[in-house]
Amino acid sequence: MKNNNKFWILFGLTILLSLSSQLFGQVNRVLNISPTAHETSVGNQSLFFRSPAHNFFTKDDSLSQVTFTRMNWLGNITEGMTFNYVEGNWKDFDISLTYMDYGQQKHTDDMGVILRNFSPNSFIVYLGWGTQLNYKDIPMKNTFIGFSGKFIKHDLFTEKGSGLLLDAALHQKNILDLFDLDVMLNNWGYAPKIGSVSTEIPTNIGIGTTIEKNNLTFYNQWNFYKGYYTHGQGVKYRYNNFLNLKMGYFNDVEYKLNYPTLGIDLKYANYVLHVGYIGGSDNLPLRNTLLTSINVEF
């Protein structure tokens, strides 16, 4: 009997450690979350809104801005998970801070007595820079490049880890007088190590196109990971420079995340309110997620 009990105890520990390793290994997926409502509502168009090369192209030297986002995450399956994001644009630089709180957890002893509460979390610091590309000291009117770095730290209570990731981006404007092109290598570098577990980095090559026709803007973006890809598409209707109506669709076959998105932007003076909504089927963990971002220009 003792040998039999010992077998099941060892078996259970093996399964538990395996699950922990898988969870730790996937913790960097926080990097794939679209942090603002205006990005999410057109099918997660991260290149158009956050590529350092594209941000430099759209930069107004007289304008700086700050964006704030806070939302409940995976509210259909858990409580207490929050996503918090703040971004600032100044001259040629973009700076952002991301804080993901995975919700309050309980640490118990072997008898089930609660010893303390804790909140595992992830923290990301981002710095991006862009510039116009020169050829033989002559500026190339339609070509821009950008680079960015991310410091990421995970605090999972019993284990901690940090890493450094880099991005490189290209923005090519007005190809064939039809569309703009964004290309970006995302998330390559030193992966955080959680205890003895090596984490997986969501390294990918992103390709995005943008077409503007009168008051309509059409977006497409493909993200190519090792062995699979995701695709987002969206459209924005602009009305009198104070109202945007948006819709999109995101498709991730590998992780079975397929959902429509909706959004609206309202601008008053130097303030812009972005509201986004994620729809989807009843079994989608992200279903009915509401995102609100506030943009302040100065």
For the regions a language model picked out, list residue spans one by one.
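Bacterial N-terminal signal peptides that target proteins for export
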Residues: K2-F11
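Bacterial N-terminal signal peptides
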Residues: L10-S20
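Subset of outer-membrane beta-barrel
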Residues: F24-F298
